[in-house]
Amino acid sequence: MHTIQMSIYVLGLLVALALIFDFMNGFHDAANAIATVVSTGVLKPQTAVAMSAVFNFVAIFTVGVHVATTVGKGTVDPSVVDHYVVFGALVGAIIWNVVTWYYGIPSSSSHALIGGLVGAAVAKSGTGALVGSGLLKTVIFIVVSPLMGFVLGSVVMLIVSWVFVRSTPRKVDTWFRRLQLFSAAAYSLGHGGNDAQKTIGIIWMLLIVAGVTAPTATEPPLWVIISCYTAISLGTLFGGWRIVKTMGQKITKLKPVGGFCAESGGAITLFVATAAGIPVSTTHTITGAIVGVGSAQKASAVRWGVAGNIVWAWIFTIPASAFMAAIAWWIGKHIL
């Protein structure tokens, strides 16, 4: 990978911007990890946020950096990446996150970042800047991750319903109010493990381009890993409350047993994707799982209109953030 001349101030600005995105990722996507456990009344919002923040950070000790490698080297051609491309990608993703947070739309921070990278790279060098195989893997999992969440959420719900068929509703509720603490923790662990790595990949790519880190390095610097996990944990701690209601109650009404099944299905999907180095959307995953839980009870339990609006937000995320990133790239060329 080529290196470019970059002042320490510009490098510092871009690293700070990446950490701001990571903070906003935690802030924006906090609802994914806590919405079910809050909406079922198992935990109070403040307690749920604190628990989620802790497990987002703990993920640093439990997963590798496979996702960071995909984002840093497998989405766009590293030879076209410079500080302008990174600036455009981050600004485009941040703007889309702010817009969707303001309107309470549970869109994907992950795909906003991928879209930002694509838009800025194409603005600089055309479509030849894209790594087709890596981008295809990401696009495929836009569909696969919510489907996996849907299937696993519904299967777990059906199994649980069969196992506890003779139990009283009160007994089931008591059991799953406890079990949901574990499933919520597992989902937060999966969220931190997959999502923080996307920003690690961006900063790693930036450091290689600036000549600070060797392009042959197999892992990013330790300070990058710690900084990114800290930023996403702090973002989670402050939480994006506008989205909690949509995720927790508007799609389908959840009880503790449903919350447990949705979080379990979502967590399994995230762990599998992270192990495979695939940057999936935690938003897509938990939404699919929630819909799966609702439909396992009965199709009418799902508010399909709300689910449809969320799908439209997913479809527009990559092109919208790519468009904003292309504009930000052009602006960055004139101010950095």
Which ranges hold each PLM region?
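Multi-pass alpha-helical transmembrane bundle typical of ion/small-solute transporters
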Residues: 1-336
